[in-house]
Amino acid sequence: MVDKIIITALQDEANPIIEFYNLTRDAKQPDLKVYANNKYNLLVTGVGRKKVIDTLPIYLNRIYNSNSILINVGIAGGNPSSTKIGNIYYIEKLTSDFFKKEYVFPLTDNIIIPKIGLTTVEKNINKNNNNIYKELVDMEAAVITDIAIKYLDLSKIKILKIVSDHMNIMDWSNLNIRKLIQSNIESISSLIKLNE
């Protein structure tokens, strides 16, 4: 069983991590997009609540153990008043537009990545009218956490988000997600190392 479980929604979020840790496609799990080595396992869920619900429970049932740590890595939209495009943030508080739950993650002094709140939304936000979202938004983290909490203590769930936009993108085809993750790979790996 693997101790480090990395979750991404998009293949472009996963690829720099796959390369960094020298992960290979797990042939034993052809029904899921899983990449692994003897120390790390990475699942690409797909975008949105339904995709996470369809993949993550199956995956965790197969690989979870009591020493597991789950790290969700991905892009997020950010409020221009509180975030900068390309910056990585450690999520300290998580809410959603569809669950009535709020998760407050335990912090340790060792985490030097800036901390911020995240709201999981149902659909892409391309206009933050009335400044509703004050920090970050994504489409998976609350669903991932809601499922993972059935297996892991909240202290064993970590979320890292890299700001890809200021909630103003209409055409996602020009966004270089791979580069955003790649430019933050050292911060990602340092958080994973802290939990070894």
Q: What label would you give each PLM region?
A:
Residues 1-3, 38:
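A short, charged/proline- and glycine-enriched loop
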Residues 3-28:
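N-terminal beta1-alpha1 ligand-phosphate binding loop
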Residues 28-196:
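Glycine-rich phosphate- or other oxyanion-binding loops that anchor nucleotides, phosphorylated ligands
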